Every structure is written in C-alpha cells, then in structure tokens.
Regions:
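N-terminal hydrophobic targeting/anchoring segments and the immediately downstream early-domain regions
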Residues: 1-65, 69-81, 346-350
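Active-site mouth loops of central-metabolism enzymes
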Residues: 8-20, 87-107, 187-200, 258-266
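Second-shell residues forming the walls of enzyme active-site clefts
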Residues: 19, 40-58, 63, 75, ...
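Glycine-rich anion/phosphate-binding loops
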Residues: 43-49, 95-114, 146-154, 196-199
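Glycine-rich, aromatic-flanked loop segments that form ligand/cofactor-binding clefts
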Residues: 56-85, 105-131, 151, 155-175
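Surface-exposed, active-site-proximal loop segments in enzymatic domains
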Residues: 78-96, 134-144, 184-186
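Short glycine/serine-rich loop/turn segments
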Residues: 123-146, 173-192
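Extended, intrinsically disordered, low-complexity segments
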Residues: 300-350
C-alpha cells in the first residue's frame, strides 16, 4: 500500500452533490487528508459513487472519505440504502436475548460498512459509546445501552461487522456525552461528576475495547473535576487518560470545530492548534467555508511517523469494491435478514 505521506490532518466538507471549483481548491491543499459528507451531498447511490470517485481521483494517495452514518436519526444516506435502526434497539434486543443481539449487531455493522464501501465511502464515525443515562437528548437513542459492559460487547460486534466489510471504526464521544444534558452543537455541556465515576462507567468501553478500537472522537464536553477545557482540547483526557491510562493507540478526531462547544478555544485556527496540541490527529471543520480557508492559510502542523501509522490503520486497504461484489453475496443477504428482525430494511431509491 502506498504510504499516506501526502495527506494532512484537516477534515473538510464539500458544498453539494458535485465538487465545485472551491471544493477542489481546498481539497488539493496538502493540509487536507479527509472529506466528511452530509445528507446534502447525497441524492442516491449512483450519484454518491460518482462524487466519491471525483474526490478519490483528486489526490495520490487519495483523500479518505468519511460520514456520520450510525443508524436511526443519524444516517446521512437513506434512499437506496438499508435503514439501520437506532442503536438503542440493539440494547433492547440484548435485554431480551443476549446472543441474538450480538448476531444482529454484527449484521448491522456489516450492512452499514458494505453499503458505504460499495459506493466509495471509507469510514463511518461509529459506534457511539455514550451511555444511555436518560439525560441527553442529543444522544438519546443513539446510545446502545446504559450498562458500559453491554455497550462494549455490542460495539465490539458492530465493529467486527464493519471490519468484515473492510471498514475501520471510530468510537465516540470520549469520555462520554450521555450524562451532560446540553447539546454541544449549540452550547458547552458540563458534566460535574467525579473522575472516578466517569472512568468507571462512561469511559470504560474505551479501555475494554482494547486494540479493536481504531479511532476515537472526544466530546466537546467540560468535566471540571478533570480539566476546565472540553475533552477534545484537553491533554489530560487525550494524552494522559485515553492514551496513557487506557492504552489507546489509534487515531483521534476532534469533533467539528465550528460547533458551539468548540468555541471556548478561540477562532478556528486557535481551536485546531489546541486540539492538535492536546493529542488529536485530525481536526474537523464543517459548514463554514470561510473558517476552512482561514485554517488552511494559517494552521501550523508537523507530520510524525505516529500520524502516518494511525492514518494507515484507518484504511481502506484497497479501492471500493464493485457493488455486485458485496451487495449480491450470500453474506450480505444473510446480514440483511438478521437486521430485518430488528426493523432494518431497504429504503426505496428515488
């Protein structure tokens, strides 16, 4: 595999369903390493495949393409893709039948990963490892369960399904967004609990998943008992606790630096520098083209061997498979059948 030496730490979005001249200019900047897609970038599977082809052909080695495609209300692509139920449905199945829940979680990961890979998407920011404390509306049914042991087992199964489809995983939102009630898209959530309480519950899956966890996205949540900075800007959380105490060796993605929860660090350049200094490998800048241009003009960054190793671990190991290679296989059909028992099924193409 060609080493990803030409790719940088910035993750940007694009305007629409085709690349504009401004998109191309930004994506060809050496600081950019990845593109994140949203629902506005999608009209159907064929269009998505063509957009991904455009993006991949811009650079050598190709830019990585990511998406938030968890299932439930956070599933960016719908028409022509299988409906993935919210992750809480897997938790409810666990309460009824542990082994069946494990089987369906694996099927969900495989279907999710296979369908994205067949259209050219390289990475989905999933699984959600937040606990369902019944307090956070922005998390809510995105969480698998209230018990961190159950979350770990189901997330491992879902991640195994992703891996079978050739896709890495990304656990979020470290160390946990399930307790703080505020939404970090529009506010700065605060979790006042003790470090011991957070480590024993919310952060536990990040340690228990071990080397099976490829990437992590920290929360824009402040935990005053540990640090006055949100976790995504905190060397204590990322370097000392996530990497040092929990032994995590994969990539760390900041959450979107244009969210309200990230503004405590300053403008987009200051926020990106703070996130990278805290231990993030990649920084996301979404839905603000002026901020993206400002960041590309002023960000100071130095490549390290650790960055290249973590980027390579995210894959993919090769180009996207032809849809027929995956979507007409017996394994895919069996996974669809398993997922249907949870309410998953096809969404009609437009």
């Amino acid at each position: 595999m060609t080493p990803p030496a030409a790719l940088g730490p910035v993750v940007l979005d694009v305007a629409g369903t085709q690349l504009t001249p401004d998109d191309r200019r930004r994506l060809c900047h050496p600081l950019v390493g990845m593109v994140i897609l949203f629902a506005r970038n999608f009209t159907g599977p064929a269009q998505l495949a063509e957009l991904c082809r455009e993006i991949h052909e811009l650079r050598d080695p190709p830019l990585r393409i990511a998406v938030d495609h968890e299932g439930g209300r956070v599933q960016r692509f719908r028409a022509g893709f299988t409906h993935i139920p919210p992750m809480a449905a897997l938790g409810r199945r666990w309460d009824e039948d542990v082994l069946d829940a494990c089987k369906v979680a694996l099927a969900a990961g495989f279907v999710l990963g296979a369908e994205l890979r067949a259209r050219g998407v390289d990475l989905s920011f999933t699984p959600v490892l937040d606990l369902d404390w019944g307090r956070s509306a922005v998390i809510g049914d995105r969480a698998l369960h209230a018990d961190p042991r159950v979350v770990t087992v189901l997330a491992n199964q879902l991640s195994h399904g992703l891996a079978l489809a050739g896709m890495a995983n990304c656990g979020k939102h470290f160390p946990g967004h399930g307790w703080a009630a505020a939404d970090s898209h529009v506010d700065v959530p605060v979790d006042e609990r003790s470090f011991e309480a957070i480590l024993a519950a919310d952060a536990a899956p990040y340690g228990w998943m071990g080397t099976g966890l490829d990437a992590v996205m920290p929360a824009h949540v402040v935990f005053p008992a540990v640090d006055v900075q949100p976790a995504g800007f905190s060397p204590r959380w990322i370097r000392e606790i996530l990497r040092g105490r929990l032994g995590f060796t994969g990539a760390v993605f900041s959450d979107d630096l244009c969210m309200a929860g990230a503004r405590v660090a300053g403008d987009v350049v200051a926020s990106a520098q703070a996130a990278l200094a805290a231990g993030c490998d990649f920084v996301l800048v979404c839905n603000d083209s002026a901020a993206a241009d400002q960041l590309l003009a002023h960000l100071q960054w130095r490549r390290t061997p650790a960055f290249d190793e973590r980027l390579a671990r995210l894959g993919p190991r090769d180009g996207p498979p032809a849809p027929a290679q995956v979507l007409q296989t017996a394994r895919y059909r069996a996974a669809l059948q398993d997922l249907a028992s949870l309410g998953g099924g096809p969404t009609p193409a437009r």
